[in-house]
A protein has these predicted regions:
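Active-site-adjacent structural elements in folded domains
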Residues: 9, 142, 261
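Hydrophobic, aromatic-lined core segments that form the binding pocket/scaffold
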Residues: 160-326
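Structured loops at beta-to-helix junctions and adjacent beta-edge loops in soluble globular domains
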Residues: 17, 27, 73, 82, ...
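Short, charged/polar micro-motifs that form catalytic or ligand-binding hotspots
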Residues: 14, 84, 144, 148, ...
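Internal, well-ordered alpha/beta segment that forms a basic, Gly-enriched binding/recognition surface
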Residues: 77, 85-169
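Long, low-complexity, compositionally biased intrinsically disordered regions
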Residues: 1-21, 26, 105, 118-120, ...
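Immediate flanking context of iron-sulfur cluster ligation sites
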Residues: 1-19, 53-91, 108
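Polybasic, low-complexity association/targeting segments
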Residues: 9-59
């Protein structure tokens, strides 16, 4: 199996009690079967506390919150499970976060979640990065290798595009359609950026920011600060962090089109999330981290955005192109 990871992947280290946010609050933690059995069998006060907050739902086990906090989160910011039992006793979710793992059959890609403040700092402070590979890709897959090869090729082109384009958001949206056509079987041809930007000007509507924000206000909202941010946007101009954010989003979602060959809805997801961060304003890294915590870490929210790519009035091509060019 080939394993691919960004060249910065191994630089991440949890900053624990120094973290300005915490992955130990505001969401229930999914607990794998092995650790759920371990926690339920633990003797003493720690076992009693764990059993009090372990709940089963739809075949899965969760460690639920105690007044908005993980019941294992100590006042000093450290984890009671880790300090009393060791890191090996952590459930998979807590052990792995914020590390991502995407299995594409012939190879696996690793990455970092943007919803962690420290990984967000790493991701958005870089001007670019490359993949480090080890092992050999397997030949048998559930998809046509041609499709994955095209997605890998167009993903790199998309990442290069948003790094250099004057208007990276609108350029990426139009490039997504170009890449979709190639994936659908059309003959490969160079992407004409000047012509695409002229097209963007022709297609852009008057721009409806409220319709765009309504899409996100209608999603599940985890925290009150996020609700307030959505109600009080403070748009800012393009910054280098926006290009880094686009590269992160492209790296995370582009290849997922191999499952259904719908690259356009993922391109619109990427553009919409990056555009949202610009419209909300504030510190670019903090806003992106909060966006990821609220949206990317909620599968139902991501599914709603993918479904709404073709139906939501705020996510039409005309509206997105207009807002990305403001």
């Amino acid at each position: 199996m080939e394993l691919r990871k960004p060249d910065f992947y191994d630089t991440f280290h949890c900053i624990a009690a120094c973290c300005p946010d915490s992955c130990c609050k505001e969401w229930d933690v999914a607990v794998d079967e092995e650790k759920a059995a371990l926690y339920r069998a633990l003797p003493g006060a720690l076992g009693e506390k764990l059993r009090e907050f372990l709940q089963d739902e739809d075949g899965d086990t969760y460690l639920t919150l105690d007044n908005g906090r993980c019941p294992m989160w100590r006042a000093d910011g450290l984890c009671r499970i880790q300090t009393e039992l060791g890191e090996h006793a952590l459930c998979n979710t807590c052990r792995d976060f914020p590390r991502l793992r995407h299995d594409y059959g012939s190879f696996t890609e690793l990455g970092l979640e943007l919803s962690c403040p420290e990984s967000a700092r790493i991701l958005l402070s870089r001007d670019g990065w490359s993949w480090v590979s080890q092992g050999k890709a397997e030949e048998k897959t559930d998809y046509d290798q041609r499709d994955m090869d095209l997605l890998l090729k167009t993903r790199q082109a998309a990442m290069d595009l948003v790094t250099g384009a004057e208007e990276p958001l609108s350029a990426l949206l139009l490039y997504t359609y170009h890449a979709q056509a190639i994936l659908d079987g059309e003959e490969e041809a160079p992407f004409d950026l000047p012509a695409a930007m002229e097209t963007a000007g022709d297609l852009a509507g008057p721009g409806n920011r409220e319709a765009f924000l309504k899409v996100f206000r209608d999603l599940e909202i985890l925290t009150e600060p996020w609700r307030k941010r959505l109600e009080s946007p403070s748009p800012r101009p393009l910054q280098k962090e926006d290009r880094a954010l686009l590269r992160y989003l492209i790296s995370r979602y582009w290849l997922q089109a191999v499952s259904d060959f719908d690259l356009v809805c993922r391109g619109k997801l990427i553009v919409s999330l990056a555009l949202l961060c610009r419209i909300l304003g504030g510190d670019a890294v903090q806003t992106a981290q909060l966006m990821s915590k609220e949206i990317e870490n909620d599968a139902e929210n991501i599914d709603a955005l993918l479904d709404g790519a073709y139906t939501a009035p705020g996510l039409t091509d005309a509206n997105l192109l207009a807002l990305t060019r403001e």
